[in-house]
């Protein structure tokens, strides 16, 4: 049983902490992931202490040397945690004292774990956002490249899960790529709000010892210094925003996965997943299950739960730091790991997906050209509302006769409107249908080519300004 007096905070305590409480209170099992960020923060802070005259140059060098050795131990996997290590800060400071002795006790001068932990988190999440951005842009590039190659393939577009209009397969791919581009842009904006220095704020009131926060900012490469010490040490809106960002990104990935799951069924047979991203059944040997996509879809729910759970934690807190905020790190780590894995799996699925061109084209049907009948009449000078009504009557007539739209005779069509003539036969061509949507953003080939080019330009600019 550990003595409370031996803790970093143990001066006013006597006796020992209950072992169950000690385990309950400990966070080192997961916050050790921030070991590098914690060391970087301490390296910067001791330089600020030296500038303020609170440690000598010799003491600073001893501390920096000790921190370098701790960094090496963590890097090599030889750092040994003890039961007394409450968190990553305690562990690193304990080890520093073992290595260099008394000067280690000066490192925490004027610093609280309140500003230390939030500095660690901002450093860790800043780097993690860069990694997520890289995985996200790789997925987008995979999608754009695929769209460029398969631009001539047509298949049904759906609304309300009903066949709607013919579109290009590439148009569907790019619809998801564009949404992910916005996610990448949002991640860049989020990183700006993460990249604010809290170190030097103390526990609540600030730092009274002349620590140069601008020096800290430069050392740790933050964009700015926090404005208010109470806000700096207690606010976790940047974590909440990260969790929301992840929830929205996962929503987009879940929707894409749902589409592909449907398209991969025998009833649709538009796509086939690679064996590398599928599994089978323990009972039914014919099964090829889209587990990769189903897991992506399910992971969205996991991320939503982390986001809503953390917001519920925050909404009940009074001002400044409370131990409830220990919940922030597990949510942050879990969501990062989840989204990072999902993006990599999604890239693999998209890059190896096999498409059934014949199946896609076979699924196109004349009833999907009903809107084109209305457009035909509009081009003949008829108001759209009237044209829409008459195209509905064309559909009704075909259903009454039990035939497809394109099997109606010219006489049948003329019985509905005298504007129909021999050129109506062009309406029954699916390529003609998609090629009429030439306004920017449409599914005509020229428009889809433009989308590909624009996204490739975006990718190039994004690569040049990596967050």
From Swiss-Prot:
Active site: 160, 281
Alphabetical list of NCBIfam families matching this protein: argH
Gene it is expressed from: ASL
Organism placement in taxonomy: Eukaryota, Metazoa, Chordata, Craniata, Vertebrata
Pathway linked to the protein: Amino-acid biosynthesis; L-arginine biosynthesis; L-arginine from L-ornithine and carbamoyl phosphate: step 3/3; Nitrogen metabolism; urea cycle; L-arginine and fumarate from (N(omega)-L-arginino)succinate: step 1/1
GO biological process: arginine biosynthetic process via ornithine; L-arginine biosynthetic process; urea cycle
Keywords: Amino-acid biosynthesis, Arginine biosynthesis, Lyase, Urea cycle
Disulfide bonding pattern of the chain: none
Binding site for 2-(N(omega)-L-arginino)succinate: 27, 114, 159, 289, 321, 326, 329
GO cellular component term of the entry, any: cytosol
Name assigned to this protein: Argininosuccinate lyase
InterPro entries: Arg_succ_lyase_C (IPR029419), Argininosuccinate_lyase (IPR009049), Fumarase/histidase_N (IPR024083), Fumarate_lyase_CS (IPR020557), Fumarate_lyase_fam (IPR000362), Fumarate_lyase_N (IPR022761), L-Aspartase-like (IPR008948)
Listed PANTHER family: ARGININOSUCCINATE LYASE
Entries under SUPFAM superfamilies matching the protein: L-aspartase-like (SSF48557)
Entry's EC annotation: 4.3.2.1
Reactions catalysed: 2-(N(omega)-L-arginino)succinate = fumarate + L-arginine
UniProt subunit comment: Homotetramer.
GO molecular function: argininosuccinate lyase activity
Domain of life: Eukaryota
């Amino acid at each position: 049983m550990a003595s409370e007096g031996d803790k970093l905070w143990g001066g006013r305590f006597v006796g020992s902490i209950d072992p169950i409480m000690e385990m309950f209170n400990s966070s080192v099992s997961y916050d050790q992931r921030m070991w590098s960020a914690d060391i970087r923060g301490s390296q910067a802070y001791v330089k600020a202490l030296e500038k303020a005259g609170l440690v000598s140059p010799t003491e600073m060098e001893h501390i920096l040397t000790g921190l370098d050795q701790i960094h090496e131990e963590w890097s090599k996997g030889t750092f040994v945690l003890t039961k007394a290590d409450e968190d990553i800060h305690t562990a690193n400071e304990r080890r520093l004292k073992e290595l260099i002795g008394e000067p280690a006790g000066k490192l925490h001068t004027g610093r609280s774990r309140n500003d230390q932990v939030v500095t660690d988190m901002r450093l860790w999440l800043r780097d993690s956002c860069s990694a997520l951005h890289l995985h996200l842009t790789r997925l987008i590039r995979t999608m754009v490249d695929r769209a460029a190659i398969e631009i001539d393939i047509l298949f049904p577009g759906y609304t309300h899960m009903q066949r709607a209009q013919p579109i290009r397969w590439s148009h569907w791919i790019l619809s998801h790529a564009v949404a992910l581009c916005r996610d990448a842009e949002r991640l860049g904006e989020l990183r700006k709000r993460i990249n604010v220095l809290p170190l030097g704020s103390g526990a609540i009131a600030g730092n009274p010892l002349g620590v140069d926060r601008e020096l800290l900012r430069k050392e740790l490469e933050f964009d700015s210094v926090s404005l208010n010490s109470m806000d700096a040490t207690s606010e976790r809106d940047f974590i909440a925003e990260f969790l929301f960002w992840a929830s929205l990104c996962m929503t987009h990935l879940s929707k894409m996965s749902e589409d592909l799951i449907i398209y991969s069924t025998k009833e649709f047979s538009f796509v086939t997943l690679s064996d590398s991203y599928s599994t089978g059944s323990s009972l039914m040997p014919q099964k090829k299950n889209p587990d990769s996509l189903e897991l992506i879809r399910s992971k969205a729910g996991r991320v939503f739960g982390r986001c809503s759970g953390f917001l519920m934690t925050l909404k009940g807190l009074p001002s400044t730091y409370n131990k409830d905020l220990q919940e922030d790190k597990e949510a942050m780590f879990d969501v990062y790991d989840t989204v990072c894995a999902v993006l990599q799996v999604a890239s693999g699925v998209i890059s190896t997906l096999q498409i059934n061109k014949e199946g896609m084209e076979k699924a196109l049907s004349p009833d999907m050209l009903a809107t084109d009948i209305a457009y035909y009449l509009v081009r003949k000078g008829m108001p759209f509302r009237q044209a829409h009504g008459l195209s509905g009557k064309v559909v009704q007539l075909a259903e009454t006769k039990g035939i497809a739209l394109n099997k109606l005779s010219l006489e049948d069509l003329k019985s509905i409107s005298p504007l129909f003539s021999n050129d109506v036969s062009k309406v029954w061509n699916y390529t003609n249908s998609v090629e009429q949507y030439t306004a920017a953003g449409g599914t005509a080939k020229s428009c889809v080519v433009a989308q590909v080019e624009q996204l490739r330009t975006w990718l190039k600019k994004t690569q040049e300004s990596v967050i």
